Amino acid sequence: MPLHRVEALGEPQDRTGKTFSGRTNGPISSPLTDTERRMSIPQNPAPVNLVGLSREEIAALLRDMGEKPFRAKQLWHWVYHRGETDFSAMTTLGTPLRAKLAETCVVARPHVVREQRSEDGTRKWLLRFPDGNEAETVYIPEDDRGALCVSSQVGCTLTCRFCHTGTQLLVRNLTAHEIVGQFMAARDAYGEWPSPTDESRQLSNIVLMGMGEPLYNYDNVAKAIGILLDNEGIAVSRRRITLSTSGVVPMIRRCGAELGVNLAVSLHAARDEIRDEIMPINRKYPLAELMAACREYPGASNARRITFEYVMLKGVNDSEADARALIKLVEGVPCKFNLIPFNPWPGSGFECPPIRHIERFANILFEAGYTAPIRMPRGRDILAACGQLRSDSLRERASLHKARLAAGVADDHAPAAAPLADTPGAVA
């Protein structure tokens, strides 16, 4: 398959089928069925979505069209710097090229199924991809800027007991097109095209802390980060991208060597016996191995510290002894902590400790020389806070909707009818 076909909106339709000649020396066959007739007609391949293509792939696509190399830079500028979706508006491209692109390509974002806004300004989008699967993306505002929390998988395979996403089994990895598309859809919503300067942009940071484990989808995540970093396109600074992992030890080293982005580690316990219970991945990569990988992370220094995320769970990991064990555990790692009050979700079985307990925990870390802010919940009222993301499948939502109606319960959350293809253009 040619390189430029990798990120098509959908697989080409099946072109196999019987060959029927107009003349035959044998007996006359029976009339074609409707299905056979449709199969015998050649189908056009699905359009190529330019979002998610690398520079090399865009260059290959244009080369196959007979275009000169400089056109790749121009097209890159229109797609990733200006966010343009209409080929006719790409005025630096020749008219014949624009016509060819319009016939064979699209510049599409994921379809926005639902947008929710929190009282604190947090925004959450439920995005649908061409195959009907969905993921959530969250914008977290901070004064005049903010971070976009991006998902890397539909569902998650890790089943961390305190995380709502972990209750949704892994469906599949997101492609580079779908990861980059989340950011571009958010830019559409905020009108941040062309790419603004670092000082003026609202979507200033990207955190790969949404649904899924990024290091279990490394190739697609790495490709997406490369596109996001390119200073002639979306142009997000490397120091403003943070990748969060639950502790996939072998991939932590590779991430540091190849990507060099900020690293956050979902730690949540200082002792193996506790972490084994709340984070099953610890049974494969225990704390000693995880800390060794963190100490070796390229670029980690006092000026660029690893962030350890620590969800405070009442009676589980919030004691003074836990705080002291944490200090001993991270010795030799340039790091800081984010203490996260547990954000409840239906059926979790956990509780958040009283704030005074969390403050006491933070003070112990602070007195040992570590920065340990308490990260106050954002978007909790729309289930957009840390650990609350989950995108039920269309089938699950339809089943729940049917059950509610059968029980005579009013339901304002019926599954929306939407095309199983990306939505070209700006987000509504």
Swiss-Prot record:
Biased composition annotated in UniProt, kind: Polar residues: 18-33
Cofactor note: Binds 1 [4Fe-4S] cluster. The cluster is coordinated with 3 cysteines and an exchangeable S-adenosyl-L-methionine.
Region (Disordered): 1-44
Residues noted as binding [4Fe-4S] cluster in the record, renumbered to the chain: C156, C160, C163
EC top class named in words: transferase
Gene Ontology BP annotations: rRNA base methylation; tRNA methylation
GO molecular function, one term: rRNA binding
Disulfide bonds: C149-C386
Pfam families the UniProt entry points to: Radical_SAM, RlmN_N
Subcellular location: Cytoplasm
PROSITE patterns associated with the record: RADICAL_SAM
EC number: 2.1.1.192
Keyword annotations from UniProtKB, A to Z: 4Fe-4S, Cytoplasm, Disulfide bond, Iron, Iron-sulfur, Metal-binding, Methyltransferase, rRNA processing, S-adenosyl-L-methionine, Transferase, tRNA processing
HAMAP family found in the cross-reference section: RNA_methyltr_RlmN
Protein's job: Specifically methylates position 2 of adenine 2503 in 23S rRNA and position 2 of adenine 37 in tRNAs. m2A2503 modification seems to play a crucial role in the proofreading step occurring at the peptidyl transferase center and thus would serve to optimize ribosomal fidelity.
Protein family per UniProt: Belongs to the radical SAM superfamily. RlmN family.
Record's miscellaneous remark: Reaction proceeds by a ping-pong mechanism involving intermediate methylation of a conserved cysteine residue.
Protein's name in the database: Dual-specificity RNA methyltransferase RlmN
Source species taxonomy: Bacteria, Pseudomonadati, Pseudomonadota, Alphaproteobacteria, Rhodospirillales
Chain's gene name: rlmN
